[in-house]
């Protein structure tokens, strides 16, 4: 006899959200699981953090980023536009009234290298970051009106072992200059074509508090909402609320959860002997793991009329195949079970 799929999934959800949610949470980690994409812009730490080795491609570099960020290391995103995309082993819930994500860099007072956070919900359920990105709007939207450049675009041109030329869509051009402290190639070594990035450009935040002959650059922190903008020990400054999400037109977007996170360097700035301003990232975590799992577990039920032998997310989206994390499987007898893919 075929069981009612809605009743079955509801029972499963209740089990997850009540008696067994704490045990279930032990199967998951609050820390990021893996890096999906690593595309830095040119910079003095590129090809070093992480280290490029001959033959590495984009996938190999992403794997090195995963290794670094899950073992206490650091990843540099280079200049404006350079980004990293990563995921957790579960969806992160947008908990009302709370910040949801902690993302750390290597910032400190006077050395803010702000990166913008973008988030994505896996709406098509395929486990890939190929749905719609939303920016988490930070304080510059209100504190620097008229100074933020939206839809800013920059193109870098390879110039092996030399300064890296760039042009932007504002009619400007310049160079990512080499310095004496880093002797490796500054352009990502696994790429041999122009690199173009588009995003929100924040105002320059560097002030020379020294002299022309003895410069001392102070990089002022923004009020909130950016990675590598403050010390990692300042958990409030390094925390982000999914409720800050906006679409491409800067309109607020309501997201119940997210599955992918992207951080990109949001300034195009050179600071003399210090070099370019480049966002770094050292880790990320879900600030409320149990609540994320519980919220996901009580999402909407699966359609009664679905075919057998199907795979679903807990929110009821049909999947073409199992993905990492929790999958709901209905077999040919109409029975439902959970399968966790690590």
Regions found by a protein language model. Give the residues of each.
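Predominantly extracellular/luminal cell-surface or secreted proteins
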Residues: 118-122
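Residue-level detector of functionally pivotal "anchor" positions at catalytic/ligand-binding pockets or at interdomain
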Residues: 292-318
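Short, surface-exposed loop/turn motifs with a glycine/proline- and acidic-biased composition
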Residues: 312-333
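C-terminal tail/sorting-segment detector
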Residues: 4, 326-342
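Acidic, glycine-anchored loop motifs typical of Ca2+
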Residues: 123-132, 148
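A domain-level signal for the mature, folded cores of soluble proteins
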Residues: 24-113, 138-294
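Bacterial Sec-dependent N-terminal signal peptides
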Residues: 1-26, 298-299
């Amino acid at each position: 006899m075929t069981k009612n799929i809605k009743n079955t999934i509801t029972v499963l959800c209740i089990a997850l959200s009540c008696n067994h949610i704490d045990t279930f949470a032990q199967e998951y980690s609050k820390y990021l699981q893996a890096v999906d994409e690593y595309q830095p812009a040119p910079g003095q730490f590129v090809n070093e953090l992480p280290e490029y080795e001959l033959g590495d491609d984009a996938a190999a570099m992403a794997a090195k980023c995963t290794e670094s960020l899950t073992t206490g290391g650091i990843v540099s995103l280079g200049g404006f536009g350079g980004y990293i995309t990563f995921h957790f082993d579960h969806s992160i819930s947008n908990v009302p009234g709370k910040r949801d994500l902690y993302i750390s860099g290597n910032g400190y007072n006077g050395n803010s290298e702000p990166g913008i956070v973008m988030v994505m919900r896996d709406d098509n359920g395929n486990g890939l970051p190929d749905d719609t990105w939303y920016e988490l709007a930070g304080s510059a939207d209100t504190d620097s009106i008229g100074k933020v450049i939206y839809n800013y675009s920059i193109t870098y041109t390879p110039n092996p072992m030399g300064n890296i030329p760039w042009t932007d869509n504002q009619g400007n051009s310049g160079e990512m200059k080499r310095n004496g402290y880093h002797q490796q190639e500054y352009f990502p070594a696994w790429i041999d074509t122009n690199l173009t990035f588009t995003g929100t450009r924040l105002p320059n935040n560097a002030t020379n508090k020294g002299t022309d002959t003895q410069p001392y650059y102070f990089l002022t922190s923004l009020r909130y909402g950016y990675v590598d903008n403050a010390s990692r020990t300042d958990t409030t400054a390094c925390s982000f609320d999914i409720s800050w999400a906006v679409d491409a037109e800067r309109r607020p977007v309501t997201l119940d959860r997210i599955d992918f996170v992207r951080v990109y360097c949001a300034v195009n700035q050179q600071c003399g002997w210090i070099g370019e301003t480049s966002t770094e990232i050292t880790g990320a975590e879900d600030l409320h793991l149990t609540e994320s799992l519980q919220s996901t577990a009580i999402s909407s039920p699966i359609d009664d009329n679905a075919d057998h032998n199907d795979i679903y997310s807990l929110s009821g989206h049909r999947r073409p195949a199992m993905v990492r994390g929790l999958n709901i499987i209905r077999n040919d007898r109409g029975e439902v079970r959970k399968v966790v893919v690590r």
